Amino acid sequence: MAKTIQAYIKLQVSAGTANPSPPIGPALGQKGINIMEFCKAFNTRTNNLEKGLPIPTIITVYSDKSFSFITKTPPASVLLKKAAGITKGSSKPNQNKVGTITMQQILDIAQIKKIDMTGSNIDNISKSIIGTANSIGLIIAEGTNK
């Protein structure tokens, strides 16, 4: 007999550094999940990623208190800020530009995001990432990466 799903929990958890403190502990604890078991499994699955990178995670909680989880790719805005070498986006992206990113860097990010995004091809995904870059105040430079 198949397990019945009790709930879905969506969290952004830092890669390789999951611990029982908020927001993980309270979110999982109220559903009756073994928090340390999740933290160990998550850290094992994300140990090949850069520590501290926020990873969107969807946790499926079953009625017998077991769980499974899916990790997604980091948000495009995080990847863009990392590629541009900035820590935060512009508060007025149309007026103040805070960094520059090349088209090659956008294509590299599109390749990473291709796994999760529903865009039919790399061009559509790149356009979406360009929109995100504009919304955080980045200038798109022509040319290749360094």
UniProtKB/Swiss-Prot annotation:
Any one GO molecular function term: large ribosomal subunit rRNA binding
Example of a GO cellular component annotation carried by this entry: cytosolic large ribosomal subunit
Ribonucleoprotein among keywords: yes
Record's keyword annotation contains RNA-binding: yes
The organism's place on the tree of life at top rank: Bacteria
CDD domains: Ribosomal_L11
Post-translational modifications: One or more lysine residues are methylated.
Alphabetized UniProt keyword annotations: Methylation, Ribonucleoprotein, Ribosomal protein, RNA-binding, rRNA-binding
Biological process annotations from GO: translation
Function: Forms part of the ribosomal stalk which helps the ribosome interact with GTP-bound translation factors.
Quaternary structure annotation from Swiss-Prot or TrEMBL: Part of the ribosomal stalk of the 50S ribosomal subunit. Interacts with L10 and the large rRNA to form the base of the stalk. L10 forms an elongated spine to which L12 dimers bind in a sequential fashion forming a multimeric L10(L12)X complex.
Family: Belongs to the universal ribosomal protein uL11 family.
Classification via HAMAP family: Ribosomal_uL11
Protein name: Large ribosomal subunit protein uL11
